[in-house]
């Protein structure tokens, strides 16, 4: 039994080093974190925009897509027909029309000096949606994950 505790502690420490890569900052809801990561009404400079995200996670995120639309318009996609997400859940929704977006990809650097390339796109998207949490806008469903770009 005494041997199990140090092993469990080691596993928790190792898990904690991996988990923050996908963890949502504690003071944000999933929808708020989605908005920070993926909603920018106008085109942007990837190095600056990604710096804001990377400051939350303390690492260089390898890739990120920003939708150039409002949170309200993206949330409206949650009212469309549900489809199956990449993870097998049935809470995804596809946009009916393409939107402008910027795809940012890590090219070099280590946090906090992350460098990104930018690619402008005009495509459809699929978002996962969930009921709002306390602090979210009062929609029936809110976007919480950018599942796919088509």
From Swiss-Prot:
The active site is at residues 38, 145. Keywords: Antibiotic, Antimicrobial, Disulfide bond, Endonuclease, Glycoprotein, Hydrolase, Lysosome, Nuclease, Secreted, Signal. Residues 1-23 form the signal peptide. InterPro entries: RNaseA, RNaseA-like_dom_sf, RNaseA_AS, RNaseA_domain. Pfam families: RnaseA. Ribonuclease which shows a preference for the pyrimidines uridine and cytosine. Has potent antibacterial activity against a range of Gram-positive and Gram-negative bacteria, including P.aeruginosa, A.baumanii, M.luteus, S.aureus, E.faecalis, E.faecium, S.saprophyticus and E.coli. Causes loss of bacterial membrane integrity, and also promotes agglutination of Gram-negative bacteria. Probably contributes to urinary tract sterility. Bactericidal activity is independent of RNase activity. Belongs to the pancreatic ribonuclease family. The record marks 61 as: Critical for catalytic activity. PANTHER family: RIBONUCLEASE (PTHR11437), RIBONUCLEASE K6 (PTHR11437:SF4). The keyword Hydrolase applies. GO terms for biological process: antibacterial humoral response; antimicrobial humoral immune response mediated by antimicrobial peptide; defense response to Gram-negative bacterium; defense response to Gram-positive bacterium; innate immune response. Its main location: secreted. This is Ribonuclease K6. Interacts (via N-terminus) with bacterial lipopolysaccharide (LPS). One of its GO terms (cellular component) is extracellular space. It comes from the Eukaryota. The keyword Nuclease applies. GO terms for molecular function: endonuclease activity; nucleic acid binding; RNA nuclease activity. It comes from Saguinus oedipus (Cotton-top tamarin). Glycans are attached at residues 55, 100. SMART domains: RNAse_Pc (SM00092). It is found in: Secreted; Lysosome; Cytoplasmic granule. Disulfide bonds join 46-104, 60-114, 78-129, 85-92. CDD domains: RNase_A_canonical (cd06265). Substrate binds at residues 61-65, 86, 105. Its EC number is 3.1.27.-.
């Amino acid at each position: 039994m005494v041997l199990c505790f140090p092993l469990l502690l080691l596993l928790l420490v190792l898990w904690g080093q991996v988990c923050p890569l996908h963890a949502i900052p504690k003071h944000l809801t999933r929808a708020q974190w989605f908005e920070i990561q993926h909603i920018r009404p106008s085109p942007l400079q990837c190095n600056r925009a990604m710096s804001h995200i990377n400051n939350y996670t303390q690492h260089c995120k390898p890739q990120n897509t920003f939708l150039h639309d409002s949170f309200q318009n993206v949330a409206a996609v949650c009212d469309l027909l549900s489809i199956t997400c990449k993870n097998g859940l049935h809470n995804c929704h596809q946009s009916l029309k393409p939107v402008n977006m910027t795809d940012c990809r890590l090219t070099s650097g280590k946090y906090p000096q992350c460098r990104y390339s930018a690619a402008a796109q005009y495509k459809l998207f699929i978002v996962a949606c969930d009921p709002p949490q306390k602090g979210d806008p009062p929609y029936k469903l809110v976007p919480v994950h950018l599942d796919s770009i088509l």
